[in-house]
């Protein structure tokens, strides 16, 4: 090794720290000097004569009273006289005179601080030379007290470090010298390959032999060996599935490598290849790894990029290994790497020092054994962090056996400081034991000292032991306090976790029970109960449990959590409420109820009699509600979806509940076994009774509707008996219309049902076929088109305008089962029903409610389908067939075949005053009503009305309407009820009228709704007869006839009106009369078909009815 320059003080200090050089210089340069412990060995060996006797010198220990020769190793914390700031490295003792002066001036206190870092074998050797006694005489002893200082780690935490526990001598905080046997030795094999050329690596045959598996091939050059290993073994096909494994004979690597380059670098250890050569002139160093070459280059450049990570240290190093050694030795003073060879207690701060110790002291054989005994996952590069606790494997060394190993775990913030304190205490405790052993082996030195010195030493030692015991007790108390605090925090955290788990278990239990009852959607959270669309559905739907009102009382979180086995079981299935008396379609319901399977019948409990007497309009759903229980024989439709077909596309699939005749249409295709797939989003469901669709087909003489609904019923109804009841209704509806084709008989229907429900039949493919999808699209579009018409649509009732919240309160009380007598009296009295006229009487709102319900039932049977009126509503010419103009919905000619059902038109020609028109129309109404009611009183009132006051005019109308209303044979009564139903809704006739081209000279066209300002007034006389006072504005909505009236200015009011195309014939009995209202009107006579021989003048302004053939 080259000697460092004398001008560089850092280099000199570093060399002195490594113990390789002394301060003196001779002609040969820097010379090595022996360390303190080596000098002690030499001194101990020279003290003995060959004969076994000791040499007595003039400096006998008995003369100066210093004790035995072991005091040579006594050191003092106070620098001796021969160690000064000007000469810190002078290890030789001064002259004898100075020793005598100093010994007489100060008292000597023996200490064993020098023995704390040395081995016991070296300390037990007796030394009695004159030089040793003189050296020991110049020293003064102190009490071995453990001191601690705080240093700042790189992470900002304070680390406790012991001071005065260094094994070797320290000068100004720096170590001098290295342990024996740690100097670098040359390799065992003298051959060193340079690998500078192709054929320059001439080595012996045994060194150039391939030891891969069972190869044993020999080569002349190193390059040939390396090429052979790379091509034949490393990168050959033997490495299957990229399992890079070294199979060199004697290799202790048992694991595979993650990449090929790692195996290539590893094999260089066996072949001796070192391709990375230093380019520095005159150096010639070679390395097998490139990172080692980069580290070596820094020795030439002087670069030191690895700085010490402690804040108060400015040291820098050329490689990370030296920095780690410095931090472990200087800042932590821990020795976690201990020698595992028996009877060896050496421990070191880094693994490299341990390896050097094993090679130098125990030999290469022990090193190879220790190397092979390492675990498979051991890595030389894994070094412990000096800021953390030592590794677990190091705890087996006696140095690291803490005296309070049973203490509790301390807090996280002080774990590092506590570990370092414990390690320092452990080292001091072990060193004290070793010192006591040394005293027992060499003899007690206390009698050899003067009494004052012995007393002071004993007092200092007792004081030190008391301090150590006090520190240990304090640390144990602190650890116990911290452990108690941590235990309390853990108990609180555990209690919070148990409470949270209890809440979660409650929610999971409730959700599982609700899911088992099919009352909770898996895609939506618990929702509060919502209003039912009508009383019929409300009475059939059981109350839905929610988080606010669950099905049963859930245990509170304050009670301890019960075990899973003691969880409450699911309650009994909810039994739906019985259907009230006289439901809609009693006959059909009875038939469906008779053929229901026994397993679907549930025992029903009798309900309160007050609920059975309540009859509310079934179409009072004014907001989106959850799906109620569908009545038997109902066809369900999805709501929403603007797909150009009014929300009824043909891509949906239907499902039938067996036994009930219920068909449901969903947005997802059905599976092979008929179950409905779950769709995305919220689906509001409304229902059509199958009889409603059949009635609709009969009303419009549409045979295609009959066949389609029967096909859907066959496909979706699994129960044959339910299908047979539907087929009977189909036959009865088929007889009511003129047919062009033969209907299916029951045998054909049964065969088609067997085909659809055969396990081998692919229902999904059939449902997704283009023909069926087109059929479904047209079918549901027609249903939506029919319900879009205002005259036939069952619309929700404006509750706020009719009864001022009475109906809302009634529904709320019925839903919750609380309907007392006081509320019933208030509901029947109906003090304020919303009518703002001065003649308002109690009960008018309820009476109008019931009458309108009866009239509307004739239009469409309980159809609960909300159709949004927009430009994109599914309006097409004819519903079926002619769909070319379906995108031209804004034109007048693009109208459905339903538009001719109620198309009233009022064409006013050269009119001057609307009041004149109304008066003339009133006269015409009077003349029409007078044909059926001929009384003297009415004639007198009519004559007085023509020329009398307004009061007589009003009284005459009242008598006229009163008589006509209670005359069951009167046609005015039938029209009057229709007008009451239509006029209550504010926009009933808005879609019923359209303007046509007026004759020449016409200057205004009036809309029926804008011109008709009808007001209903009711009075209840002593005979409980309802008197309806009504201003009848136009004949189109009352009588349904056409005509023209000419007033005084010869201006004509031309009224043109078409009759409905079919009758409102019903196949099932209706409800019983309620509140003494008249029974529903009989169906009107079917209109006469228009022929070409009819009046052509009247047919010019009347739109022609489209004919639809299928």
From Swiss-Prot:
Extent of Low complexity compositional bias: 188-201, 597-606
Annotated compartments: Cytoplasm; Nucleus
Gly residues compositional bias, start-end: 641-652
UniProt-listed Gene3D superfamilies: Classic Zinc Finger (3.30.160.60)
Region (Disordered): 1-103, 170-202, 363-397, 594-682, 875-895, 1057-1110
Family matches, as InterPro entries: GLI-like, Zap1-like_Znf1, Znf-C2H2_ZIC1-5/GLI1-3-like, Znf_C2H2_sf, Znf_C2H2_type
Keyword Protease: no
GO annotation, biological process: cell differentiation; central nervous system development; female germ-line sex determination; female somatic sex determination; gonad development; negative regulation of transcription by RNA polymerase II; positive regulation of neuron apoptotic process; positive regulation of transcription by RNA polymerase II
Biased composition (Basic and acidic residues): 44-61, 886-895, 1092-1103
Polar residues bias locations: 65-90, 669-678, 1057-1066
Residue ranges that the Swiss-Prot or TrEMBL entry lists as coiled coil: none
Entry keyword set: Cytoplasm, Developmental protein, Differentiation, DNA-binding, Metal-binding, Nucleus, Repeat, Sexual differentiation, Spermatogenesis, Zinc, Zinc-finger
Keyword Nucleotide-binding: no
Primary localisation category: cytoplasm
Entry's free-text remark on domains: Only isoform a (Tra-1L), is thought to bind DNA. Zinc fingers 3, 4 and 5 are the most important for DNA binding; removal of finger 5 almost abolishes DNA binding and prevents the selection of binding sites.
Assembly behavior: Interacts with the MX regulatory domain of tra-2.
Protein name: Sex-determining transformer protein 1
Native source species: Caenorhabditis elegans
Name of the gene: tra-1
């Amino acid at each position: 090794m080259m000697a460092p320059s004398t001008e560089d003080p850092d280099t000199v200090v570093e060399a002195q720290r490594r113990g390789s050089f002394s301060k003196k210089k001779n002609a040969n340069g820097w010379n090595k000097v022996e360390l303190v412990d080596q000098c002690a060995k030499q001194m101990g060996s020279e003290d003995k004569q060959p004969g076994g006797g000791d040499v007595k010198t003039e400096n006998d220990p008995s003369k100066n009273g210093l004790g035995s020769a072991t005091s040579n190793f006594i050191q003092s914390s106070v620098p001796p006289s021969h160690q000064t700031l000007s000469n810190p490295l002078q290890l030789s003792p001064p002259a004898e005179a100075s020793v005598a002066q100093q010994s007489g001036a100060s008292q000597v206190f023996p200490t064993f601080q020098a023995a704390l870092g040395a081995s016991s074998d070296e300390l037990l050797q007796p030394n009695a030379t004159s030089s040793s006694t003189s050296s020991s005489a110049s020293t003064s002893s102190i009490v071995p007290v453990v001191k601690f200082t705080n240093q700042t780690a790189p992470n900002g935490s304070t680390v406790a470090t012991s001071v005065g526990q260094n094994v070797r001598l320290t000068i100004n905080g720096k170590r001098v010298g290295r342990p024996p046997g740690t100097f670098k030795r040359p390799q065992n094999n003298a051959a060193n390959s340079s690998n500078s050329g192709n054929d320059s690596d001439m080595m012996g045959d045994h060194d150039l032999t391939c030891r891969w598996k069972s190869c044993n091939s020999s080569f002349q050059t190193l390059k040939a060996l390396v090429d052979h290993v790379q091509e034949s073994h490393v990168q050959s096909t033997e490495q299957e599935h990229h399992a890079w494994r070294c199979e060199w004979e004697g290799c202790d690597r048992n694991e595979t490598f993650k990449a090929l380059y790692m195996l290539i670098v590893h094999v260089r250890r066996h072949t001796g290849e070192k391709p990375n050569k230093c380019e520095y002139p005159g150096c010639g160093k070679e390395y097998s790894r490139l990172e080692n070459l980069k580290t070596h280059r820094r020795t030439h450049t002087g670069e030191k990029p690895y700085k010490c990570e402690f804040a108060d240290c400015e040291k820098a190093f050329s490689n990370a290994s030296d920095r780690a050694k410095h931090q472990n030795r200087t800042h932590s003073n821990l020795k976690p790497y201990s020698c595992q060879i028996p009877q060896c207690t050496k421990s070191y701060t880094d693994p490299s020092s341990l390896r050097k110790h094993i090679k130098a002291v125990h030999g290469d054989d022990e090193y190879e054994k220790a190397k092979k005994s390492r675990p498979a996952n051991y890595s030389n590069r894994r070094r412990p962090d000096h800021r953390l606790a030592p590794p677990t494997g190091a705890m087996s060394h006696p140095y690291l056996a803490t005296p309070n190993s049973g203490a509790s775990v301390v807090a996280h913030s002080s774990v590092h400081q506590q570990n370092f304190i414990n390690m320092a205490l452990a080292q001091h405790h072990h060193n004290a034991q070793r010192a006591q052993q040394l005293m027992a082996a060499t003899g007690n030195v206390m009698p050899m000292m003067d009494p004052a010195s012995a007393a002071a030493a004993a007092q200092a030692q007792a004081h030190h032991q008391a301090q150590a015991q006090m520190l240990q007790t304090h640390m144990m108390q602190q650890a116990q306090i911290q452990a108690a605090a941590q235990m309390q925090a853990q108990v609180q955290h555990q209690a919070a976790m148990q409470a949270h788990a209890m809440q979660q278990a409650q929610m999971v239990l409730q959700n599982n029970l609700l899911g088992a009852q099919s009352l909770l959607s898996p895609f939506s959270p618990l929702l509060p109960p919502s209003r039912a669309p009508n009383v019929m559905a409300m009475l059939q739907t059981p109350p839905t449990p929610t988080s606010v009102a669950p099905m049963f009382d859930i245990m509170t979180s304050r009670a301890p959590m019960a075990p899973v086995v003691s969880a409450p079981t699911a309650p009994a299935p909810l039994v739906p409420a019985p259907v009230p008396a006289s439901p809609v379609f009693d006959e059909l319901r009875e038939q469906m109820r008779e053929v229901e399977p026994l397993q679907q019948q549930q025992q029903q409990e009798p309900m309160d009699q007050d609920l059975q007497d309540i009859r509310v309009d079934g179409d009072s759903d004014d907001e989106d509600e959850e799906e109620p229980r569908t009545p038997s024989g109902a066809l369900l439709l999805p709501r929403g979806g603007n797909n150009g077909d009014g929300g009824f596309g043909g891509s949906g699939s239907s499902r039938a509940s067996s036994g009930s005749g219920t068909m449901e249409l969903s947005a997802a295709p059905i599976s092979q076994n008929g179950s409905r797939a779950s769709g995305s989003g919220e689906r509001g469901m409304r229902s059509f009774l199958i009889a409603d669709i059949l009635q609709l087909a009969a009303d419009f003489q549409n045979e295609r509707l009959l066949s389609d609904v029967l096909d859907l019923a066959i496909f979706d109804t699994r129960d044959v008996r339910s299908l047979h009841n539907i087929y009977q209704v189909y036959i009865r509806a088929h007889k009511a219309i003129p047919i062009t084709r033969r209907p299916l008989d029951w045998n054909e229907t049964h065969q088609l049902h067997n085909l659809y429900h055969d396990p081998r039949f692919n229902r999904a493919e059939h449902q997704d076929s283009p023909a069926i999808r087109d059929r479904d699209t047209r079918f549901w579009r027609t249903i939506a088109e029919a319900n879009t018409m205002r005259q036939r649509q069952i619309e929700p009732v404006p509750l706020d305008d009719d009864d001022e919240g009475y109906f809302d309160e009634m529904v709320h009380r019925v839903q919750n089962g609380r309907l007392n007598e006081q509320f019933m009296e208030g509901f029947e009295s109906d003090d304020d029903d919303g009518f703002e006229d001065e003649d308002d009487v109690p009960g008018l709102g309820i009476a109008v409610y019931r009458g309108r319900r009866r009239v509307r039932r004739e239009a469409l049977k309980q159809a609960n389908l909300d159709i949004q009126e927009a430009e994109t509503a599914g309006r097409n010419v004819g519903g079926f067939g002619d769909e070319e103009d379906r995108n031209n919905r804004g034109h007048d000619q693009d109208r459905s075949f339903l538009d001719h059902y109620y198309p009233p038109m009022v064409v006013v020609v050269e009119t001057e005053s609307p009041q004149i028109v109304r008066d003339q129309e009133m006269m015409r109404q009077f003349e029409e009503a007078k044909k059926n009611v001929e009384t003297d009183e009415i004639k007198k009132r009519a004559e007085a009305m023509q020329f009398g006051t307004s009061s007589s005019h009003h009284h005459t109308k009242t008598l006229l309407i009163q008589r006509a209303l209670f005359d069951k044979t009167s046609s005015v009564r039938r029209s009057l009820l229709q007008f009451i139903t239509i006029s209550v809704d504010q926009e009933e006739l808005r879609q019923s009228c359209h303007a046509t081209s007026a004759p020449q000279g016409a200057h205004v066209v009036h809309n029926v709704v804008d011109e008709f300002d009808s007001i209903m007034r009711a009075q209840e006389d002593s005979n409980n007869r309802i008197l309806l006072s009504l201003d009848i504005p136009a004949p189109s909505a009352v009588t349904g006839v056409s005509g023209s009236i000419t007033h005084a200015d010869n201006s004509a009011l031309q009224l043109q009106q078409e009759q409905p195309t079919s009758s409102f014939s019903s196949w099932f009995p209706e409800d019983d009369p309620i509140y003494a209202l008249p029974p529903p009107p009989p169906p009107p006579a079917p209109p006469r078909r228009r022929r070409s021989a009819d009046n052509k003048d009247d047919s010019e302004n009347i739109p022609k009815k489209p004919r639809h053939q299928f």
